[in-house]
Amino acid sequence: MRSGFLSGARRLWARRAFSRTPPPSEELLARGGPLRAFLERRVGSEAGGLDAGYPQLAAAARLLSEKERELRDTESLLHDENEDLKKLAESEIALCQKQITELKHQIISLLVPSEEMDGSDLILEVTAGVGGQEAMLFTSEMFDMYQQYAAFKRWHFETLEYFPSELGGLRHASASVGGPEAYRHMKFEGGVHRVQRVPKTEKQGRIHTSTMTVAILPQPTEIKLVINPKDLRIDTKRASGAGGQHVNTTDSAVRIVHLPTGIISECQQERSQLKNRELAMKKLRARLYSMHLEEETAKRYNARKIQVGTKGRSEKIRTYNFPQNRVTDHRINKSLHDLESFMQGDCLLDDMIQSLKDCSDYEALVEMISRRD
């Protein structure tokens, strides 16, 4: 039974790996598909059925079959001569199709194992890459986009570091982001983002290409990580940058070095040295935990195609092409043609992230099946 499911899923996966287009759930759960056949057999079995261990999944699978049967029965009414009945049927069909799609997504979410840190908060880091001042300007826009996305999702957003350039861009910044499933959504943003546009200072009208890097570090509520105080070197210095009389008058900036790994965490955002030390320590713990998590993730998910978190940051994951008003995510080959709205950090960004999540769920499901073969 499992081998038939596995071979069918692998055939679908082979096509997906070539086309790299979503949505996977529609194919996997299509009538006669490998996953659908597997679910129907398990639901119908008396011994060891889904009801015993997965009652919610069994209920969703049964409801899906009922809704599809209801859809077929209603579609037959489209040929009726009564126009009022046909209009009523069209309305019922639209509702059924929506419910079927929702049930398929629910079943996939129940089947796909959750990542350990999906429910965690996170540390967001943005850093200007290749492209000089244009890269710094784009980095500033990206940081603003994520701050607006956090507001759109009603998450907490607290700036930890902010190092602007002299001409208005942003060299580097970090923020603590918290809220329901914040890491589950934001983990797909980690990587190199490329921008193509004509700078305002470009007199010849030539398109310049610049890059910036996003790092997403999981920040669980309770990090089970022991840090020996003897492994830390903590330095204080006077804050630099904007700040009025506060600048260069108190040793409020804090720099923590983790000696075994060489990881450095700094914070000068607050006027209080104690608060800066607390925030710097928070960042350090997140970076150390992320390092540990990446090692474990690499062991468990070596074949995953969708970049998650901070893995493979040398690979460009997304291009923002301003002359074409286009944003393209190269991992799933998806393009949107409303770049200005995308940069507002609301519905369009959320839609892109959901598409990445759908493809990631598909890969995780096929991988889970492979391990059970």
UniProtKB/Swiss-Prot annotation:
GO terms for cellular component: mitochondrion. The keyword Ion transport does not apply. SUPFAM superfamilies: Release factor. A motif (GGQ) lies at residues 243-245. Its main location: mitochondrion. Residues 229-293 are annotated as: GGQ domain. Keywords: Coiled coil, Methylation, Mitochondrion, Protein biosynthesis, Transit peptide. GO terms for biological process: mitochondrial translational termination. GO terms for molecular function: translation release factor activity; translation release factor activity, codon specific. Methylation of glutamine in the GGQ triplet by HEMK1 is conserved from bacteria to mammals. It is found in: Mitochondrion. Residues 56-110 form a coiled coil. Residues 1-25 form a transit peptide. InterPro entries: PCRF (IPR005139), Pep_chain_release_fac_I (IPR000352), Pep_chain_release_fac_I_sf (IPR045853), Prokaryotic/Mito_RF (IPR050057). The modification N5-methylglutamine is found at residue 245. Belongs to the prokaryotic/mitochondrial release factor family. Mitochondrial peptide chain release factor that directs the termination of translation in response to the peptide chain termination codons UAA and UAG. PANTHER family: LD18447P, PEPTIDE CHAIN RELEASE FACTOR 1-LIKE, MITOCHONDRIAL. The GGQ domain interacts with the peptidyltransferase center (PTC) of the large ribosomal subunit to trigger nascent chain hydrolysis. This is Peptide chain release factor 1-like, mitochondrial. The gene is Mtrf1l.
